[in-house]
Protein backbone atom coordinates (compact mmCIF):
# COMPACT_ATOMS: atom_id res chain seq x y z
CA UNK A 1 0.00 0.00 0.00
CA UNK A 2 1.13 3.52 -0.73
CA UNK A 3 1.23 6.41 1.70
CA UNK A 4 -1.15 9.35 1.90
CA UNK A 5 1.47 12.10 2.10
CA UNK A 6 -1.11 14.79 1.42
CA UNK A 7 -2.57 14.51 4.91
CA UNK A 8 -0.51 14.67 8.09
CA UNK A 9 -1.61 13.31 11.46
CA UNK A 10 0.04 14.01 14.80
CA UNK A 11 0.46 12.33 18.15
CA UNK A 12 1.31 14.44 21.18
CA UNK A 13 3.50 12.59 23.64
CA UNK A 14 4.59 13.85 27.06
CA UNK A 15 7.91 15.23 25.77
CA UNK A 16 7.54 15.43 22.00
CA UNK A 17 5.04 15.68 19.15
CA UNK A 18 5.17 13.00 16.47
CA UNK A 19 4.17 13.82 12.88
CA UNK A 20 3.01 10.96 10.67
CA UNK A 21 1.42 9.93 7.41
CA UNK A 22 -1.03 7.04 7.19
CA UNK A 23 -1.02 4.32 4.58
CA UNK A 24 -3.76 4.60 1.98
CA UNK A 25 -5.68 1.78 3.63
CA UNK A 26 -5.35 3.52 7.01
CA UNK A 27 -3.77 0.49 8.68
CA UNK A 28 -0.16 1.69 9.03
CA UNK A 29 1.53 4.91 10.12
CA UNK A 30 4.89 6.40 9.14
CA UNK A 31 6.42 8.83 11.65
CA UNK A 32 8.72 11.06 9.64
CA UNK A 33 9.26 14.01 12.00
CA UNK A 34 9.44 14.53 15.76
CA UNK A 35 9.16 17.96 17.35
CA UNK A 36 11.32 18.28 20.45
CA UNK A 37 12.75 21.03 22.67
CA UNK A 38 16.00 21.31 24.59
CA UNK A 39 14.07 19.94 27.61
CA UNK A 40 13.14 16.69 25.85
CA UNK A 41 14.96 13.76 27.49
CA UNK A 42 13.05 10.82 26.09
CA UNK A 43 11.68 9.93 22.68
CA UNK A 44 9.02 7.31 23.30
CA UNK A 45 7.54 6.65 19.90
CA UNK A 46 3.86 5.66 19.95
CA UNK A 47 2.96 2.16 18.76
CA UNK A 48 -0.15 3.52 17.03
CA UNK A 49 -1.29 6.87 15.63
CA UNK A 50 -5.04 7.33 15.16
CA UNK A 51 -5.51 3.58 15.32
CA UNK A 52 -2.88 2.89 12.65
CA UNK A 53 0.11 0.71 13.57
CA UNK A 54 3.45 2.56 13.32
CA UNK A 55 5.64 0.50 10.98
CA UNK A 56 8.01 3.12 9.59
CA UNK A 57 10.22 5.77 11.22
CA UNK A 58 12.47 8.40 9.64
CA UNK A 59 12.60 10.80 6.75
CA UNK A 60 12.91 9.57 3.20
CA UNK A 61 14.12 11.68 0.29
CA UNK A 62 10.99 10.55 -1.59
CA UNK A 63 9.06 12.95 0.66
CA UNK A 64 10.80 15.96 -0.83
CA UNK A 65 9.09 17.97 -3.50
CA UNK A 66 10.87 17.37 -6.80
CA UNK A 67 12.02 20.97 -7.09
CA UNK A 68 13.51 20.65 -3.63
CA UNK A 69 15.48 17.51 -4.49
CA UNK A 70 18.65 17.31 -2.46
CA UNK A 71 21.37 14.71 -2.17
CA UNK A 72 21.24 14.84 1.62
CA UNK A 73 18.81 13.22 4.00
CA UNK A 74 17.38 14.43 7.31
CA UNK A 75 17.15 12.90 10.75
CA UNK A 76 13.94 12.49 12.72
CA UNK A 77 14.16 16.13 13.89
CA UNK A 78 14.22 17.41 10.32
CA UNK A 79 17.89 18.42 10.53
CA UNK A 80 20.03 17.80 7.45
CA UNK A 81 22.67 15.08 7.75
CA UNK A 82 25.72 15.36 5.50
CA UNK A 83 28.03 12.43 6.16
CA UNK A 84 30.54 13.56 3.54
CA UNK A 85 30.95 16.86 5.38
CA UNK A 86 30.91 15.49 8.93
CA UNK A 87 27.46 16.89 9.74
CA UNK A 88 25.63 14.38 11.95
CA UNK A 89 22.34 16.22 12.41
CA UNK A 90 22.97 17.35 15.99
CA UNK A 91 20.81 20.25 17.10
CA UNK A 92 19.83 22.23 20.20
CA UNK A 93 16.38 20.63 19.97
CA UNK A 94 17.72 17.15 20.73
CA UNK A 95 20.66 18.14 22.93
CA UNK A 96 19.27 16.37 26.02
CA UNK A 97 17.61 13.31 24.49
CA UNK A 98 18.98 10.36 26.48
CA UNK A 99 16.62 7.54 25.59
CA UNK A 100 14.77 6.35 22.52
CA UNK A 101 12.02 3.72 22.52
CA UNK A 102 11.03 2.72 19.00
CA UNK A 103 7.55 1.42 18.05
CA UNK A 104 7.25 -2.31 18.75
CA UNK A 105 5.87 -3.16 15.29
CA UNK A 106 8.48 -1.16 13.37
CA UNK A 107 9.65 -2.73 10.10
CA UNK A 108 11.43 0.19 8.35
CA UNK A 109 13.98 2.43 10.07
CA UNK A 110 15.16 4.98 7.52
CA UNK A 111 18.79 5.96 6.98
CA UNK A 112 19.97 8.90 9.14
CA UNK A 113 16.80 8.54 11.29
CA UNK A 114 18.50 8.74 14.69
CA UNK A 115 21.79 10.35 13.72
CA UNK A 116 23.15 13.15 15.89
CA UNK A 117 21.51 12.03 19.16
CA UNK A 118 24.71 12.46 21.13
CA UNK A 119 23.45 11.53 24.63
CA UNK A 120 21.59 8.29 23.89
CA UNK A 121 23.40 5.43 25.65
CA UNK A 122 21.46 2.35 24.58
CA UNK A 123 18.89 1.35 21.99
CA UNK A 124 16.82 -1.71 21.17
CA UNK A 125 15.86 -2.05 17.53
CA UNK A 126 12.47 -3.83 17.25
CA UNK A 127 12.63 -7.38 15.92
CA UNK A 128 10.63 -6.64 12.77
CA UNK A 129 13.32 -4.36 11.29
CA UNK A 130 15.15 -6.22 8.52
CA UNK A 131 17.60 -3.56 7.39
CA UNK A 132 20.03 -1.24 9.19
CA UNK A 133 20.65 1.52 6.67
CA UNK A 134 23.45 4.02 6.13
CA UNK A 135 24.08 6.59 8.86
CA UNK A 136 21.07 5.50 10.93
CA UNK A 137 22.96 6.06 14.21
CA UNK A 138 25.76 8.26 12.85
CA UNK A 139 27.18 10.57 15.53
CA UNK A 140 25.49 8.90 18.53
CA UNK A 141 28.66 9.56 20.51
CA UNK A 142 27.43 8.20 23.89
CA UNK A 143 25.89 5.01 22.50
CA UNK A 144 27.31 2.01 24.37
CA UNK A 145 24.79 -0.74 23.82
CA UNK A 146 22.60 -1.87 20.91
CA UNK A 147 20.25 -4.80 20.52
CA UNK A 148 19.98 -5.72 16.85
CA UNK A 149 16.66 -7.04 15.50
CA UNK A 150 15.95 -10.76 15.28
CA UNK A 151 14.93 -10.49 11.61
CA UNK A 152 17.98 -8.46 10.50
CA UNK A 153 18.87 -9.41 6.91
CA UNK A 154 20.79 -6.36 5.61
CA UNK A 155 23.40 -4.20 7.35
CA UNK A 156 25.24 -1.11 6.11
CA UNK A 157 28.53 -1.89 7.81
CA UNK A 158 30.44 1.32 7.19
CA UNK A 159 28.30 4.27 8.23
CA UNK A 160 25.35 2.88 10.25
CA UNK A 161 27.23 3.34 13.52
CA UNK A 162 29.93 5.73 12.34
CA UNK A 163 31.15 8.21 14.99
CA UNK A 164 29.86 5.97 17.80
CA UNK A 165 33.24 5.47 19.54
CA UNK A 166 31.79 4.07 22.80
CA UNK A 167 29.67 1.35 21.23
CA UNK A 168 31.03 -1.84 22.77
CA UNK A 169 28.09 -4.15 23.41
CA UNK A 170 26.00 -5.33 20.45
CA UNK A 171 23.68 -8.29 20.87
CA UNK A 172 21.76 -10.32 18.31
CA UNK A 173 19.30 -13.17 18.81
CA UNK A 174 20.72 -16.60 18.01
CA UNK A 175 17.53 -17.15 16.01
CA UNK A 176 18.69 -14.64 13.38
CA UNK A 177 19.02 -16.44 10.06
CA UNK A 178 21.57 -14.16 8.35
CA UNK A 179 24.15 -13.12 10.94
CA UNK A 180 25.71 -13.90 14.29
CA UNK A 181 27.65 -11.83 16.82
CA UNK A 182 30.89 -13.28 18.12
CA UNK A 183 33.12 -11.36 20.54
CA UNK A 184 32.07 -7.99 19.16
CA UNK A 185 32.26 -9.08 15.53
CA UNK A 186 29.28 -9.35 13.19
CA UNK A 187 29.74 -12.43 11.01
CA UNK A 188 27.55 -14.15 8.46
CA UNK A 189 25.62 -17.08 9.93
CA UNK A 190 28.23 -19.62 8.80
CA UNK A 191 31.00 -17.57 10.41
CA UNK A 192 32.99 -17.41 7.17
CA UNK A 193 32.64 -13.68 6.49
CA UNK A 194 33.49 -10.75 8.78
CA UNK A 195 31.05 -7.94 8.12
CA UNK A 196 31.64 -5.41 10.92
CA UNK A 197 33.26 -4.91 14.32
CA UNK A 198 31.89 -2.89 17.21
CA UNK A 199 33.57 0.55 17.06
CA UNK A 200 34.95 0.53 20.63
CA UNK A 201 37.05 -2.59 20.03
CA UNK A 202 40.78 -1.77 20.19
CA UNK A 203 42.15 -5.09 19.03
CA UNK A 204 40.43 -7.21 16.41
CA UNK A 205 41.17 -10.90 16.12
CA UNK A 206 39.61 -12.31 12.97
CA UNK A 207 38.47 -15.85 13.87
CA UNK A 208 39.94 -18.88 12.10
CA UNK A 209 36.54 -19.68 10.58
CA UNK A 210 36.60 -16.46 8.51
CA UNK A 211 37.68 -16.71 4.86
CA UNK A 212 36.65 -13.22 3.71
CA UNK A 213 36.33 -9.71 5.10
CA UNK A 214 33.64 -7.43 3.69
CA UNK A 215 34.34 -4.05 2.08
CA UNK A 216 34.72 -1.31 4.73
CA UNK A 217 34.31 -3.85 7.56
CA UNK A 218 36.79 -2.22 9.95
CA UNK A 219 36.84 1.27 8.50
CA UNK A 220 34.75 3.15 11.04
CA UNK A 221 36.07 1.78 14.34
CA UNK A 222 38.90 2.76 16.66
CA UNK A 223 40.87 -0.48 16.45
CA UNK A 224 44.64 -0.08 16.35
CA UNK A 225 45.56 -3.68 15.56
CA UNK A 226 44.11 -6.48 13.46
CA UNK A 227 45.05 -10.15 13.53
CA UNK A 228 44.04 -12.15 10.46
CA UNK A 229 43.14 -15.78 11.07
CA UNK A 230 44.59 -18.71 9.17
CA UNK A 231 41.78 -19.04 6.60
CA UNK A 232 41.40 -15.42 5.46
CA UNK A 233 41.79 -15.30 1.68
CA UNK A 234 39.73 -12.34 0.51
CA UNK A 235 39.99 -8.84 1.95
CA UNK A 236 37.43 -6.40 0.59
CA UNK A 237 37.97 -2.81 -0.49
CA UNK A 238 39.01 -0.59 2.45
CA UNK A 239 38.20 -3.51 4.77
CA UNK A 240 41.13 -2.78 7.07
CA UNK A 241 41.53 0.90 6.21
CA UNK A 242 40.56 2.20 9.65
CA UNK A 243 42.33 5.48 10.41
CA UNK A 244 43.81 4.15 13.66
CA UNK A 245 44.94 0.72 12.48
CA UNK A 246 48.72 0.67 12.74
CA UNK A 247 49.43 -3.03 13.04
CA UNK A 248 48.19 -5.94 10.94
CA UNK A 249 49.46 -9.42 11.75
CA UNK A 250 48.73 -12.70 10.01
CA UNK A 251 48.43 -16.24 11.37
CA UNK A 252 51.53 -18.28 10.59
CA UNK A 253 49.39 -20.97 9.02
CA UNK A 254 47.75 -18.52 6.62
CA UNK A 255 49.15 -19.47 3.22
CA UNK A 256 46.91 -17.15 1.18
CA UNK A 257 48.10 -13.76 2.33
CA UNK A 258 51.75 -12.89 1.97
CA UNK A 259 53.17 -11.12 5.01
CA UNK A 260 53.38 -7.43 4.22
CA UNK A 261 54.79 -5.07 6.81
Task: Mark where each language-model region is.
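Structural signature of tandem-repeat unit edges
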Residues: 24-26, 38-55, 67-108, 118-131, ...
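Core beta-strand segments of extracellular beta-sandwich domains
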Residues: 61, 159-161
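Short beta-strand/loop segment at the start of cytosolic alpha/beta domains
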Residues: 2-35, 182-185, 189
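Hydrophobic residues on conserved beta-strands that form the core of alpha/beta folds
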Residues: 31-33, 54-57
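Short, aromatic/basic amphipathic alpha-helical patches
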Residues: 159, 258-261
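Acidic, Ser/Thr
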Residues: 34-36, 60-67
